[in-house]
């Protein structure tokens, strides 16, 4: 009898344990209302807190749930059932000001987000539903910096976290950046759908000082920049893979910068398509997009070991822009002045690009900071052309302190590629197809030391000298002469 009593006691103790730990937590059980009216922040936060303590997922069922800021905790999974929508409150008072405990560029005006995770581990956001920030409710009221960035909550703000997964969810309409991941490790973003055209500064995603990152199978359309790598702290963004994405942007679809305090290292981007945005009204940039691929170091920092391959760029004004400048902006006021940064070991191949502007692509350093080691191979650029003026004697301004943008120099002296202040460049097996007659050559090299240009083909061109090497360039070997297949 004693043994039977003991067994019963153990069963009574174990049954509630096994029922509670690992059980899912439906937010409606905690009082959340799926009416699209009631602000259910407290109820949803209770479900998150219980999930963190006891295990199990937080379930957002079908329906429209209004919420203010939610704080994710350790070991939390937000799971969205089909037709579930988490809608950001339109009241700024529902987004408390929050700090992260470290300095970064923007820490004096970035305070608020719909979902926040700070210094937590093992968090997941996944499912078949939607998170919608309703960002149009927070209009920009001034052009003055930084005030124009204030009082516009992010959608996701994930800082100093490890083991983060965002999967299969739809993200829409933030008031500011859509998803900011800063100083995170082991980050996986897979299969999400993004449409972000509700406000200014509507980036698709910002990866900032993170390492060990995998981004795959994204279909995204943003008013501002697309997949964006930043370095706004003393942490480098490194060990990153991006693959199999379809991206649209009114600005730069794939972008490194502008903030580059520590820099970027060991990044692979492959098998992606950049296409025109479905949104025709551009709050920022241009409907067709500014640039397909933009690599920028202007606030110090390094950029090294970057491999980009098999990309279709269809529509932006400029397909490719690489820039080493010297804006030298501190990431906070008391930080030391950043030195000139560096760009080295960049490999770009398999680009098929259709430009919508005659500006041309460019790879440019500055006189005191040259790009070192860049390769562009097996690419095809369709260029609009149509410029009749003679630009052979045009002296391009340096503009080393200017905000970096592929359109910053205006019309370039080459219809295909302008290269300046570079040591060791290799251009191999590149086709430039000119749609209209143009007075400019396909390639201009200005202050280049070392490297090779070979197997260049031009289609539709009528100039004999399709490659122009200025007298200040040396050790540059060109073979064979470019072929004109027009």
Describe the function of each predicted region:
Residues 5-12:
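Sec-dependent signal peptide recognition
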Residues 12-20:
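Hydrophobic h-region of N-terminal signal peptides that target proteins for export
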Residues 21-43:
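Right-handed parallel beta-helix/beta-solenoid
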Residues 31, 41, 53-101, 108-111, ...:
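N-terminal extracellular ligand-recognition/capping segment immediately after the signal peptide
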Residues 69, 89-91, 111-112, 134-138, ...:
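Short glycine/acidic-rich loop motifs that flank beta-strands on beta-rich extracellular proteins
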Residues 107, 111-127, 153-165, 185-190, ...:
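Surface-exposed loop/turn motifs in large extracellular/passenger domains
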Residues 122, 126-246, 393-398, 439-445, ...:
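Right-handed parallel beta-helix
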Residues 477-486:
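Single conserved hydrophobic/aromatic residue that forms the stacking wall/gate
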């Amino acid at each position: 009898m004693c043994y039977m009593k003991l067994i019963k006691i153990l069963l009574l103790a174990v049954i509630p344990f096994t029922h509670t730990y690992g059980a899912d937590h439906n937010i409606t059980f905690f009082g959340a209302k799926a009416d699209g009216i009631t602000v259910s922040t407290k109820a949803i936060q209770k479900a998150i807190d219980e999930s963190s303590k006891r295990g199990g997922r937080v379930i957002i069922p079908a329906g429209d749930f209004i919420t203010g800021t939610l704080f994710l905790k350790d070991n939390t999974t937000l799971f969205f059932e089909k037709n579930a929508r988490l809608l950001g409150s339109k009241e700024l008072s529902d987004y408390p000001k929050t700090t992260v405990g470290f300095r970064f560029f923007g820490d004096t005006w970035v305070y608020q987000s719909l979902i926040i995770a700070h210094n937590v581990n093992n968090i997941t956001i996944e499912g078949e539903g939607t998170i919608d920030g309703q960002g149009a409710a927070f209009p920009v009221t001034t052009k003055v910096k930084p005030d124009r960035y204030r009082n516009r909550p992010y959608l996701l703000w994930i800082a100093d976290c490890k083991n983060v997964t965002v999967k299969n969810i739809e993200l829409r309409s933030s008031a500011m950046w859509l998803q900011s991941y800063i100083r995170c490790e082991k980050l996986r973003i897979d299969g999400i759908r993004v449409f972000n055209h509700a406000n200014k500064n509507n980036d698709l995603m910002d990866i900032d000082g993170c390492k060990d990152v995998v981004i795959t199978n994204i279909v995204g359309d943003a008013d501002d920049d697309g997949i964006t790598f930043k370095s706004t702290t003393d942490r480098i963004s490194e060990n990153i893979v991006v693959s199999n994405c379809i991206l649209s942007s009114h600005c730069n679809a794939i972008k490194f910068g502008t903030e580059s305090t520590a820099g970027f290292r060991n990044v692979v981007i492959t098998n992606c398509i950049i296409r025109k945005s479905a949104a025709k009204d551009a709050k920022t940039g241009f409907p067709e997009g500014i640039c397909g691929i933009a690599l920028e170091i202007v606030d110090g920092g390094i950029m090294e070991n970057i491999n980009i391959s098999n990309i279709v760029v269809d529509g932006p004004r400029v397909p490719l822009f690489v820039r080493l400048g010297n804006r030298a902006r501190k990431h906070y006021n008391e930080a030391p002045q950043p030195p000139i940064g560096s760009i080295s070991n960049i490999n770009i191949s398999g680009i098929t690009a259709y430009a919508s502007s005659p500006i041309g692509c460019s790879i440019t350093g500055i006189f005191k900071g040259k790009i070192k080691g860049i390769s562009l191979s097996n690419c095809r650029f369709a260029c609009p052309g149509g410029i009749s003026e003679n630009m052979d004697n045009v002296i391009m301004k340096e503009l080393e302190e200017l905000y970096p943008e592929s359109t910053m120099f205006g019309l370039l002296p080459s219809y295909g590629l302008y290269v300046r202040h570079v040591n060791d460049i290799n251009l191999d097996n590149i086709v430039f197809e000119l749609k209209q007659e143009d007075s400019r050559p396909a390639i201009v090299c200005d202050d280049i030391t070392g490297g090779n240009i070979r197997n260049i083909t031009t289609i539709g061109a009528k100039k004999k000298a399709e490659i122009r090497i200025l007298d200040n360039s040396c050790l540059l070997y060109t073979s064979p002469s470019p072929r004109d297949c027009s």
